[in-house]
């Protein structure tokens, strides 16, 4: 089972395309939708939905995957639910760059202070990070500097922020998923 979390643009047709591409790895791909505008509510909702899916799951090696803001959530929810994560161009600093787009961007900073201390150290090697060199929305170099101590970083030379085509990375994602 692969759980997919969309980014800020929840209505993007690219979400459906990514789900179809992920089905080459595992036919059981589930998209969880969330508001993107209310961080504390989103966190509760995502934890509840992922937990529900894991309770009914028969896959011994589930994976959670997210793009942009969905990558922010996939890393945290995956850690809290003890499943591996794959994140594409994660938005690690939504409290800095989401002002005017969501109701309370400061809630992201608050969530960070309430998260498990040093969670990335405890999550070491359980997350695969795929970054675009052509990310027009986020500073991928800053993201790499923040995460490379803990996770493998894969650079993509073609894609933009929304990462429309993930197919060149499917084999690596499949191998990462099988590590469980």
Curated annotation (Swiss-Prot):
Origin species: Escherichia coli O9:H4 (strain HS)
Source domain of life: Bacteria
Gene3D superfamilies reported in the protein's UniProt record: alpha/beta hydrolase
UniProt lineage: Bacteria, Pseudomonadati, Pseudomonadota, Gammaproteobacteria, Enterobacterales
InterPro entries: AB_hydrolase_fold, UPF0227, UPF0227/Esterase_YqiA
UniProt xrefs under NCBIfam families: PRK04940.1 (NF003431)
Gene giving rise to this polypeptide: ycfP
Record protein name field: UPF0227 protein YcfP
Family note: Belongs to the UPF0227 family.
UniProt cross-references to PANTHER family, sorted A to Z: ESTERASE YQIA-RELATED, UPF0227 PROTEIN YCFP
